[in-house]
Amino acid sequence: MKKLIVIVLLAVVGGGLIVDSGYIYAKAELAQEFIEDAWQETLEKAKAGIEDKVKPWSWADTWPVARMQMAKHDIDLYVLNGTTGNALAFGPGYMNGSSQPGYPGAMVIGGHRDTHFSFLKDVKIGEQFSMQTKTGEVFNYRIISMDIVDVTRDKLVVDGFDDSLVKLVTCYPFDAVNPGGPQRYVVTAGLGL
């Protein structure tokens, strides 16, 4: 009888761990459908001359501000406003105050290394991706550098650039056991280079 109780308890705990570990992945993927709908509505409103923050669901504290596509890695992501934990659970996030596609300066986009930005470990210098703005305009960027930055010592530079850059930022190393360490992997891309 004790053996049966131990087996049942282990099965319940194991099942709970499996469900819990899959939760963030499922949430991130399912939310993409709602976010895609919000993005389409954002584009339609922009065509009509209406600037609006179209939230993917009524209680959302974020909304799509750009679309990033990278065919080589089969990437099609909607960039959300803000880099809070809530926003990053659903997609990569735009760092408020950084630049916009097509404008001088650096647009900074953060994402989790184990979900939306897991592909960054496979990108190479020279690869291209596109950024679509909420007005529908598309800008093509080429990767020019990949760096590892220690946030306890170094500051991510976003100002003072004459060129239009996009900086994709995620935690590093990609296979770290503990999340949120001090290192960041920064992929920098330049407009049309």
Q: What does each model-found stretch correspond to?
A:
Residues 4-193:
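Solvent-exposed, non-transmembrane regions of membrane-associated and secreted proteins
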